[in-house]
Amino acid sequence: MKNTLNDFKNQGVVPDMVQVGNETSSGILWDEGKIGGDYTDFTQLAELLNQAISGVRASVGNQTKIVLHLDNGGNNSLYRWWFDGVTGCGFDLDFDIIGLTYYPMWHGTMDDLQYNLNDISARYNKDVMIVETAYAFTLADGDGLGSSFSPQDEEIGGYPASVQGQKDFMSDLESVILNVPGNRGLGFFYWEPEWIPVEGAYWGTE
């Protein structure tokens, strides 16, 4: 990681943020950094995260924000369990942002998300960001391979699979983020528009 960031820095493109791991609810680098089930000791995971963070800081210092990211954004008990665990091992993890994945058909209601964002931003004194989210604008099969978004997902998600339904979801999500106390809600990243099978997208048309 340090070498990669040094390459970026040498080209004058220091990243605004670095996410250490992706959806790390079950840890990283199994089995050494695994957590959950029979793996109840966070020490090795915290040490791995600490080393990765140290590499980022050694390269780009504090100008780059560091994100720790879990899935299941409406599950407050998961976030308390995980962040209590990794911050309670004596490593004083130097991170700036808690990143969450949130899909309403899988991860609870907007109220669940709001509660979690409010709680963890205050409990850990960190900014929060939705680093992965999306909602379907159609139930149609766009590429002949079947749709990953079903009528059942639409029902659970609570918004029509339409352009307006997608817009309403994003508007409501924005409101939830803006309502986090102390301006701790930073925004969201949408996942992932390059997988829409438009003309010229080789994977979807060839």
Spell out what each predicted region is.
Residues T64-K65, D127, G187:
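Proline-centered loop/turn at the N-terminus of a beta-strand
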Residues V20-S25, H69-G73, L100-M105, T133-A136, ...:
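Active-site beta-loop-alpha junctions enriched in small/polar residues
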